[in-house]
UniProtKB/Swiss-Prot annotation:
Catalytic activity line of the entry: UDP-N-acetyl-alpha-D-muramate + L-alanine + ATP = UDP-N-acetyl-alpha-D-muramoyl-L-alanine + ADP + phosphate + H(+)
Gene Ontology process terms (BP): cell division; cell wall organization; peptidoglycan biosynthetic process; regulation of cell shape
Localization per Swiss-Prot or TrEMBL: Cytoplasm
Keywords: ATP-binding, Cell cycle, Cell division, Cell shape, Cell wall biogenesis/degradation, Cytoplasm, Ligase, Nucleotide-binding, Peptidoglycan synthesis
Similarity comment: Belongs to the MurCDEF family.
Binding site for ATP: G120, T121, H122, G123, K124, T125, S126
Classification lineage: Bacteria, Bacillati, Actinomycetota, Actinomycetes, Mycobacteriales
The enzyme's E.C. designation: 6.3.2.8
GO MF: ATP binding; UDP-N-acetylmuramate-L-alanine ligase activity
Membrane-crossing segments per the record: none
InterPro entries: Mur-like_cat_sf, Mur_ligase_C, Mur_ligase_C_dom_sf, Mur_ligase_cen, Mur_ligase_N, MurCDEF_pg_biosynth, UDP-N-AcMur_Ala_ligase_MurC
The protein, known as: UDP-N-acetylmuramate--L-alanine ligase
Length: 503
């Protein structure tokens, strides 16, 4: 007996090891479904799914559709990662098996729940994860589907016993318009995924259309510090959708400093200050209707994370959670896999890894890194006060997608200028074919700080180790295989313990 509609009782997933697909598979298995799938390579995610009962084949061929007795009732795929000539999709068409996209499955799994969906150009995964952790701390057991692994839970999805479903709503292909949300969080809105949408206007419109899908009595939570999401909030408030409320958060004030509203949008939470402390910080803010500010110690760095915390707070409160307990949960939030994740420390050099692959994300992460380098590791304080004061930020940046690199090369260069030293790798093409004249060198040309273009990924760890000194912070950055370099950089630092370049 399953807790699933008939069409989802036997599901085959093409690309099952991906972050989004593996999460859906976990929920299907937990609800009694039979799941098979294929992926290009073995991974930790694939092994975890096998342990839960999924039948997974490495490589793609038509025979994968026979992994489940009786074959699948439906085949699930994604727009971006799986080509239409994939042999499993071709075989599904030949057999007359329906092929649907991942968001359609997620929308079906959400039915019967109160849905809290987090959208925006950046910050979706971190905000969604923070919201989940806060609700769990408050005694809720929400179902959730997130684009990255929560450090606390070690998973990206869960079938909960409660009536709340929290999910990251991906706008990259417009698929978020399949959802029917009760609460929508919008962290920011600015041009991205233009290879799919074709224009900035079309990209922005998808957020308006998403907000219009809010249920009567629903809530839109939008960041007022971001021009794009603030404008969205103003449009939705002016439109007067039936029963839909709009709450803003951020540090922005109207002309007379009033708390009640900014440009017609009610302010639910105002950020008063964020002070970096060690690898986190202290957030001071005020909630609407309260006379006194509140303070919470956060375990993740960066002002952007402080804003994400306010978004999670307002959404969790709307779900019925207690504010004090929400803040305790936020204080205990340890981050998400590949979101300013600590890799290790060697000879006074701290190495972090981050998924940032858009200029705005790069700026936010490097801003947090600059705060961090001014808050040195306790061991560095003991070893040398001089080295602590002279620490610098070194970023190893791998551009993601040729189309995005061509569009944003100059903006990437300006964003990377927030680091003290920059190593630019070649483009990680993922699903795209190379474009003439587009490479990492295009980004490096726009960097005004000391920059090194390194097209050979294998040479980067030794190069970075030669640049680094005690007190420095190194960040490997990008959505591709740059993530593998963190431990290799630590190995290179161990191999050259006495080499510290002059500043």
């Amino acid at each position: 007996m399953t807790d699933l509609p008939a069409e989802l009782e036997r599901v085959h997933m093409v690309g099952i090891g991906g972050a989004g697909m593996s999460g859906i598979a976990r929920i299907l298995l937990a609800r009694g479904g039979q799941v098979s799938g294929s992926d290009a390579k073995e991974s930790r995610g694939v092994l975890a799914l096998r342990a839960r009962g999924a039948q997974v084949r490495i490589g793609h061929d038509a025979g994968a559709l026979d992994l489940l007795p009786g074959g699948p009732t439906v085949v699930v795929t994604t727009h971006a990662a799986i080509p239409k000539d994939n042999p499993e999709l071709v075989e599904a068409a030949r057999r007359g098996i329906p092929v649907i996209l991942r968001p359609a499955v997620l929308a079906s799994l959400m039915q019967g729940h109160r849905t809290l969906l987090v959208s925006g150009t950046h910050g979706k995964t971190s905000t969604t994860s923070m919201l989940v952790v806060a609700l769990q701390h408050c005694g809720f057991d929400p179902s959730f589907a997130v684009g990255g692994e929560l450090n606390e839970a070690g998973t990206n999805a869960h079938h909960g016993s409660g009536d709340v479903f929290v999910a990251e709503a991906d706008e990259s292909d417009g698929s978020l318009l399949q959802y029917e949300p009760d609460v929508v969080v919008v962290t920011n809105v600015e041009a991205d995924h233009l290879d799919y949408f074709g224009s900035t206007e079309a990209y922005i419109q998808v957020f308006d259309d998403f907000a219009a899908r809010l249920s009567p009595g629903g809530l839109l939570v939008a960041c007022l510090d971001d021009p794009g999401s603030a404008a969205l909030a103003q449009r939705v408030a002016a439109r007067g959708l039936p029963g839909v409320r709009v709450l803003g958060y951020g540090s922005a004030e109207d002309a007379d400093g009033a708390f009640a509203s900014v440009d017609g949008v009610e302010v639910g939470a105002r950020l008063l200050s964020f002070e970096a402390r060690d690898v986190g910080g202290v957030l001071q803010f005020q909630l609407a209707g309260e006379q006194s500010p509140r303070t919470v110690r956060m375990g993740v760095p960066g002002r952007h994370m402080a804003l994400n915390a306010l978004a999670a707070l307002l959404a969790a409160r709307e779900a019925g959670a207690d504010v004090d307990e929400i803040l305790e949960g936020i204080a205990g939030f340890g981050g998400v896999h590949r979101r300013f994740q600590f890799t290790g420390r060697e000879h006074g050099v701290r190495v972090f890894d981050d998924y940032a692959h858009h200029p705005t994300e790069v700026r936010a992460v490097l801003g947090a890194a600059a705060d961090l380098v001014r808050q040195p590791h306790e061991a560095d304080r003991r070893e040398s006060e001089d080295s602590v004061r002279s620490g610098k930020v070194i970023v190893v940046f791998q551009p993601h997608l040729y189309s995005r690199t061509a569009t944003f090369a100059e903006e990437f260069g300006h964003a990377l200028d927030l680091a003290d030293e920059v190593v630019v790798l070649d483009v990680y093409g993922a699903r795209e074919e190379p474009l003439p004249g587009v490479s990492g060198a295009l980004v490096a040309l726009s960097v005004s700080k000391p920059v090194h273009y390194q097209p050979d990924l294998s040479q980067a760890p030794r190069q970075v180790a030669a640049l680094a000194s005690p007190g420095d912070v190194v960040i490997t950055m990008g959505a591709g295989d740059v993530t593998m370099l963190g431990n290799q950089i630590l190995d290179a630092l161990r191999a050259a313990p006495h080499h510290h370049p002059s500043r």
